[in-house]
Amino acid sequence: MELNGFLRYKKLFIVLALLFTTILIVSLSLLAFALVVKTNGSELGVVFHQTEDNTTVIQGRSIVEQPWFIPTVAGSFGFSALAIILGLAIGLPIVKRKEKRLLEEKERQEQIAEQLQRISDQQEQQTVEIDPQQSQAQPSQPQVQQPLQPQFQQRVPLLRPAFNPNMQQRPGFNQPNQQFQPHNNFNPRMNPNMQRPGFNPNMQQRPGFNQPNQQFQPHNNFNPRMNPNMQRPGFNQPHPNQFAQPNNFNPNMQQRPGFNPNMQQRPNPSQLMPKGGLKP
């Protein structure tokens, strides 16, 4: 407890120590200043001594023999003692008050902890009264050694009542319908009443349906892929007195102005010889 009080109120002890140190330093500095002044400026502190050689020696008195030595030392010690007494007189009551407050707070926390413990005990008693079986000790279960590898048990399929082989069929269930008998040349998967008339093999063809058109007969020297009514005169037709021109050239077609068909092809610039003074 004393250690915790010292750690919590260390600021107070630091202030008291600084006060005591300040008073001590002030008293010692006053003592040193007085010694210096008395030694250097006092005329009464000079003593003449005559030796055997009839020579005079000037010596000063020692500090202890000075008349101000005793009062100065006594005053410095008095200030130090006064600082210690004041520090203890001020600090001790404050520390005692703080310790007393800490003790009261600790007792209060202990009381609160006891009350909480009582409340928890009462709640446990109520739960035990409501369900006494929980308070009984459960028997220890025997330890069973488990295999290292898992064992898979075979599952037995459950038979539903609809799949019972001994169960008789219900009337009208999964019975063939006598009205829908299979027809000749008919797929049994298709209902004959749903057959369209266009798919009846015994039905005659309608006139004009899927019959070749007699008006569009193939012409001589004509591509069968092209409609003859769409052929234009003088288009891609060979001349009877001339040979066939390459690239389907029509001789009856007028030439465009400025276009010479006999003009030779210009040479490729990349195939020309390099000229002098130019980089290749």
Curated annotation (Swiss-Prot):
<keyword id="KW-0200">Cytadherence</keyword>
<feature type="compositionally biased region" description="Low complexity">
    <location>
        <begin position="204"/>
        <end position="224"/>
    </location>
</feature>
<feature type="repeat" description="2-4">
    <location>
        <begin position="232"/>
        <end position="236"/>
    </location>
</feature>
<feature type="repeat" description="2-5">
    <location>
        <begin position="256"/>
        <end position="260"/>
    </location>
</feature>
<feature type="region of interest" description="5 X 5 AA repeats of R-P-G-F-N">
    <location>
        <begin position="170"/>
        <end position="260"/>
    </location>
</feature>
<feature type="repeat" description="1-3">
    <location>
        <begin position="199"/>
        <end position="204"/>
    </location>
</feature>
<keyword id="KW-1133">Transmembrane helix</keyword>
<dbReference type="GO" id="GO:0005886">
    <property type="term" value="C:plasma membrane"/>
</dbReference>
<feature type="compositionally biased region" description="Polar residues">
    <location>
        <begin position="261"/>
        <end position="271"/>
    </location>
</feature>
<feature type="repeat" description="1-6">
    <location>
        <begin position="259"/>
        <end position="264"/>
    </location>
</feature>
<feature type="repeat" description="1-1">
    <location>
        <begin position="163"/>
        <end position="168"/>
    </location>
</feature>
<feature type="repeat" description="2-2">
    <location>
        <begin position="196"/>
        <end position="200"/>
    </location>
</feature>
<keyword id="KW-1003">Cell membrane</keyword>
<feature type="repeat" description="3-2">
    <location>
        <begin position="222"/>
        <end position="226"/>
    </location>
</feature>
<feature type="repeat" description="1-4">
    <location>
        <begin position="227"/>
        <end position="231"/>
    </location>
</feature>
<dbReference type="InterPro" id="IPR009896">
    <property type="entry name" value="Cytadhesin_P30/P32"/>
</dbReference>
<feature type="transmembrane region" description="Helical">
    <location>
        <begin position="13"/>
        <end position="37"/>
    </location>
</feature>
<feature type="transmembrane region" description="Helical">
    <location>
        <begin position="68"/>
        <end position="92"/>
    </location>
</feature>
<keyword id="KW-0677">Repeat</keyword>
<feature type="compositionally biased region" description="Low complexity">
    <location>
        <begin position="132"/>
        <end position="149"/>
    </location>
</feature>
<comment type="function">
    <text>Adhesin necessary for successful cytadherence and virulence.</text>
</comment>
<dbReference type="GO" id="GO:0042995">
    <property type="term" value="C:cell projection"/>
</dbReference>
<feature type="repeat" description="1-5">
    <location>
        <begin position="249"/>
        <end position="254"/>
    </location>
</feature>
<feature type="repeat" description="2-3">
    <location>
        <begin position="206"/>
        <end position="210"/>
    </location>
</feature>
<keyword id="KW-0843">Virulence</keyword>
<feature type="repeat" description="1-2">
    <location>
        <begin position="191"/>
        <end position="195"/>
    </location>
</feature>
<feature type="region of interest" description="Disordered">
    <location>
        <begin position="163"/>
        <end position="280"/>
    </location>
</feature>
<dbReference type="Pfam" id="PF07271">
    <property type="entry name" value="Cytadhesin_P30"/>
</dbReference>
<feature type="compositionally biased region" description="Low complexity">
    <location>
        <begin position="168"/>
        <end position="188"/>
    </location>
</feature>
<feature type="region of interest" description="2 X 5 AA repeats of F-N-P-R-M">
    <location>
        <begin position="186"/>
        <end position="226"/>
    </location>
</feature>
<dbReference type="GO" id="GO:0033111">
    <property type="term" value="C:attachment organelle membrane"/>
</dbReference>
<protein>
    <recommendedName>
        <fullName>P32 adhesin</fullName>
    </recommendedName>
</protein>
<dbReference type="GO" id="GO:0020035">
    <property type="term" value="P:adhesion of symbiont to microvasculature"/>
</dbReference>
<keyword id="KW-0472">Membrane</keyword>
<feature type="compositionally biased region" description="Polar residues">
    <location>
        <begin position="114"/>
        <end position="128"/>
    </location>
</feature>
<feature type="compositionally biased region" description="Low complexity">
    <location>
        <begin position="235"/>
        <end position="257"/>
    </location>
</feature>
<feature type="repeat" description="3-1">
    <location>
        <begin position="186"/>
        <end position="190"/>
    </location>
</feature>
<feature type="repeat" description="2-1">
    <location>
        <begin position="170"/>
        <end position="174"/>
    </location>
</feature>
<keyword id="KW-0966">Cell projection</keyword>
<keyword id="KW-0812">Transmembrane</keyword>
<feature type="region of interest" description="6 X 5 AA repeats of [FM]-N-P-N-M-Q">
    <location>
        <begin position="163"/>
        <end position="264"/>
    </location>
</feature>
<feature type="region of interest" description="Disordered">
    <location>
        <begin position="114"/>
        <end position="149"/>
    </location>
</feature>
